Amino acid sequence: MSGETGLRERKKQRMYRTISETAISLFLQRGFDEVSVADVAAAAEVSKPTLFRYFASKEDLALHRFADHEDEAARVVRGRTTGETPLEALRRHFLDGLDRHDPVTGLNDDAEVLAFHRLLYGTPSLVARLFAYTGRSEDALAAALAEAAEEKEGPDDITARIAAGQIIAVQRILAQENWRRVEAGATAWGVHPDAVTAAERAFTMLRSGLAPYA
């Protein structure tokens, strides 16, 4: 039974990716507002009802890549090594992302990645939808921080929520600054040293204000 469940889940994830990548390709070619849900369904060779079983809105078709990262910060905190604090784990993870030129850090100069970011930040409805994803990232991280605090009888849930909001905001600002510089013509490798310096400074500031998680 578990094998059948795993197979179904893999098929489901493949369908998610197929529909989303098809949609993103169309959005990049024509523009978000010029592509209908029916266009995406036809290109992906699925019916509209099937498409809506996977994606609740047109915006979600474009933001599926962000959905993959929605609980990333929470997973980093829960998966940290013994003796590592939540903030240390998040700092390490972000710096590792910079080294890999992970698109989520903004430090990626691949033409398709840059085009996707232009699509995202140039489409008001996508920016608004992204705000909801950010909120869920904060909620997931707050829950993970609260769990970490309980392990050592630390601060209450409201403190965890405040901390999560600050951490997610810092990561977003760092990523947007990296993307802004790369979009202006700098290479990812050229921006990398400054990106690391900015990240180190930002996490130092977080440590001074978020002592329970540092």
Can you annotate each of these PLM segments?
Residues 168-172:
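Alpha-helical transmembrane segments of multipass membrane proteins
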Residues 72-116:
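Hydrophobic alpha-helical connector segments
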Residues 135-164:
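Hydrophobic alpha-helical bundle segments that form small-molecule/ligand-binding pockets
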Residues 111-139, 152-153:
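Short secondary-structure transition hinges
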Residues 15, 69, 94, 133-137, ...:
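Hydrophobic/aromatic residues within well-ordered alpha-helical segments
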Residues 1-46:
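Basic, helix-initiating cap at the start of DNA-binding domains
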Residues 143, 147, 176-214:
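C-terminal peripheral helix-coil segments that are non-catalytic and often amphipathic
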Residues 6, 30-32, 45, 52-64, ...:
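HTH DNA-binding helix-turn interface
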